[in-house]
UniProtKB/Swiss-Prot annotation:
Binding residues for substrate: E88, G89, T90, Y119, R164, T165, R166, D186, G187, D188
The name this protein goes by in its record: D-fructose 1,6-bisphosphatase class 2/sedoheptulose 1,7-bisphosphatase
Record organism: Prochlorococcus marinus (strain MIT 9312)
Assembly information from the UniProt record: Homotetramer.
NCBIfam families found in the cross-reference section: glpX
Enzyme Commission no: 3.1.3.11, 3.1.3.37
Pathway annotation: Carbohydrate biosynthesis; Calvin cycle
Organism taxonomic ancestry: Bacteria, Bacillati, Cyanobacteriota, Cyanophyceae, Synechococcales
Pfam families linked: FBPase_glpX
Function: Catalyzes the hydrolysis of fructose 1,6-bisphosphate (Fru 1,6-P2) and sedoheptulose 1,7-bisphosphate (Sed 1,7-P2) to fructose 6-phosphate and sedoheptulose 7-phosphate, respectively.
UniProt keyword terms in alphabetical order: Calvin cycle, Carbohydrate metabolism, Hydrolase, Manganese, Metal-binding
Length: 333
């Protein structure tokens, strides 16, 4: 992996974001996702690499493009594994709400955990709290530790939690400690990464979300030096979701075992979910969010706002790109 490849990876998420953004606010979440998938797949196909999708849009029989195991790129060059979410927060995009983005993680072949399409209990926190907070602790314990690490009182802390029924007790506990809760409807990747930057107003992410997005978050937090832990959730009673209507706890355990995951209660650290020597996170805003703006369409250009975090050179690059249209007459600053 090199800087040229990283630049091309940036362009992958930019093109996906632009494609989705054309449908922002139209209530067409599936169409927005499909547009992002197609644009991402098209741009990946132009990269000189032996790419492979390890986390994508589903199994081969479930998705026409960017399915798990799909080979992408020219077929020659460096081996790169990808975890992708071309339109993270499809509902946010469809309803023109904050926080939707095109996002991916990339690493050398074998460098990303092939997370099953399960749920994951997650804990993200700033670099100052790395290795000090722990997902095994109660929320109360972690808030006390976080308060000490950041030299803030607990009532100055803000914790992002997915707005789900399963988090009722968690939210009650956090508020009972005096900390603020910021519920979000979708899109916990951006919230997790925001914990890694001071000044975002986000100090911690707690609770259960999708496991594939956990790998993408872990890649970013590993590159940032932040704290991230994840533990797979295989009990539908804990996840409290209708998506697993046909699955039982026993059936999910069997699925994990068939995938080679025998330590089903393992707590994964960021460097286990994203273990490659070189790890890259790339995200581009579809709608405005915590970290960057969404796509802006102007008469003569399209503007994108993106973030690339890389272990290759230990950088986090915020990038504003002007995509100039054919026949443009004037580009404003």
């Amino acid at each position: 992996m090199n800087q040229t490849l990283i630049q091309e990876i940036l362009e992958v998420v930019e093109q996906a974001a632009i494609a989705s953004a054309k449908l922002t606010g139209l209530g067409q979440k599936d169409e927005a996702d499909a547009a992002a998938v197609e644009a991402m797949r098209l741009r990946m196909g132009k990269i000189e690499m032996k790419g492979k999708i390890v986390i994508g849009e589903g199994e081969r029989d479930e998705a026409p493009m960017l399915y798990i195991g799909e080979e992408v790129g020219s077929g020659s060059g460096p081996g790169v594994d990808f975890a992708v979410d071309p339109c993270e927060g499809t509902n946010l995009c469809a309803n023109n709400q904050r926080g939707s983005m095109a996002v991916l993680a990339a690493s050398d072949t074998g460098g990303l955990f092939n997370a099953p399409d399960f749920y994951m209990n997650k804990l993200a926190a700033p670099p100052a709290a790395k290795g000090k907070v722990d997902i095994r602790n109660s929320a109360t314990e972690n808030l006390k530790i976080l308060s000490d690490c950041l030299d803030l009182s607990i009532d100055e802390l803000t914790v992002v939690v997915m707005d789900r029924t399963r988090h009722k007790d968690l939210i009650k506990e956090i508020r009972g400690c005096g900390a603020k809760v910021q519920p979000i409807s979708d899109g916990d990747v951006q919230a997790a990464i925001a914990c890694g930057f001071a000044g975002t107003g986000t100090h911690c992410l707690m609770g259960i979300g999708a496991a594939p997005e956990g790998v993408i978050s872990a890649a970013a937090m590993r590159a940032l030096g932040g704290h991230f832990q994840g533990q797979l959730v295989y009990d539908p009673a804990i996840a409290q979701t209708s998506e697993w209507a046909d699955y039982t706890k026993e059936g999910n355990i069997k699925r994990l075992n068939e995938m080679g995951i025998t330590d089903i209660d393992k707590i994964y650290e960021a460097n286990e979910l994203a273990s490659g020597e070189n790890v890259v996170f790339a995200g581009s805003g579809i709608t405005d969010g915590l970290l960057f703006d969404g796509v802006k369409f102007e008469r003569d250009c399209v503007r994108t706002s993106s973030l690339v975090i890389s272990t290759l050179d230990s950088t986090a690059r915020f990038t504003n790109t002007v995509h100039i249209k054919d026949g443009a007459k004037s580009i404003s600053l």
